[in-house]
């Protein structure tokens, strides 16, 4: 069986003897899970951090205390260390034709996450299958047309396929709001997430905080909450306080 995929979640299918080809339409930031833990997260979130007296509440506060404007300067050294640590891994991926990046300004995963919420992948093993050639790769192309037993790609070539699996990542919160409520409300609220960094998929102007997250929006009584575990724990307190103040009739912005 031949399968065509549009992103890296492919290892489990390959293990069952499928002939897998992944289509990579644009460059992706890749970081190994263990490298991310040791070089970036470990000092804040690990058994060693807890043993040293750093609870997750303190770690959340420390992480949230860094202004987004200077966060790239904090992140670049860590991701430069990851580049050096996993240089052979990245070279094998590039040799296989995989398009890699570390963000517009080389600041790595977390800035991509905050700015656009896409374009990154935390690797737990599937990338080795791509690097080794066990999973075939076609990069820089998309699907032009789906045929009964094949795919015509945007470069004019044809790929035989019995099954196509779309694994194209995250959609926008604004798009979700349009589907859940209405396009009119989504347009009224405006873009959710992103900092206004004027980087790829995060147009300016600079906001200084995540757009429309955990604060009043242009639509009365509509609030947005999301993010990773740190953000969910930390900012849920501030969201809850704002809601409670309104329920109690307290004067609040």
Question: What name fits each language-model region?
Answer:
Residues 29-71:
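A catalytic-pocket lid/entrance helix-loop region that shapes and gates access to the active site
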């Amino acid at each position: 069986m031949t399968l065509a995929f549009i992103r890296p979640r492919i290892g489990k299918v390959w293990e069952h003897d499928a002939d897998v080809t992944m289509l990579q339409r644009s460059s992706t930031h890749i970081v190994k899970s263990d490298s991310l833990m040791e070089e970036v997260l470990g000092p804040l979130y690990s058994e060693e951090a807890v043993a040293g007296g750093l609870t997750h509440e303190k770690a959340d506060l420390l992480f949230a205390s860094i202004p987004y404007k200077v966060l790239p300067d904090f992140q670049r050294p860590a991701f430069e260390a990851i580049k050096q640590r996993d240089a052979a891994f990245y070279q094998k991926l590039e040799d296989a034709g995989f398009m890699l990046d570390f963000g517009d300004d080389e600041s790595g995963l977390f800035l991509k996450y905050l700015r656009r919420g896409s374009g990154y992948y935390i690797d737990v093993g599937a990338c080795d299958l791509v690097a080794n050639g066990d999973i075939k790769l076609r990069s820089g192309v998309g699907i032009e047309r789906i045929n009964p037993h094949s795919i015509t790609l945007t470069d004019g070539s044809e790929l035989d396929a019995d099954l196509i699996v779309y694994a194209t990542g995250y959609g926008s919160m604004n798009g979700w709001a349009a589907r859940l409520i209405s396009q009119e409300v989504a347009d009224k609220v405006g873009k959710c997430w992103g900092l206004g960094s004027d980087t790829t998929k995060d147009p300016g102007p600079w906001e200084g905080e995540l757009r429309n997250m955990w604060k009043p929006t242009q639509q009365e009584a509509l609030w947005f909450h999301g993010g990773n575990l740190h953000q969910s724990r930390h900012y849920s307190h501030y969201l809850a306080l704002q809601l409670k103040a309104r329920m109690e009739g307290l004067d609040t912005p």
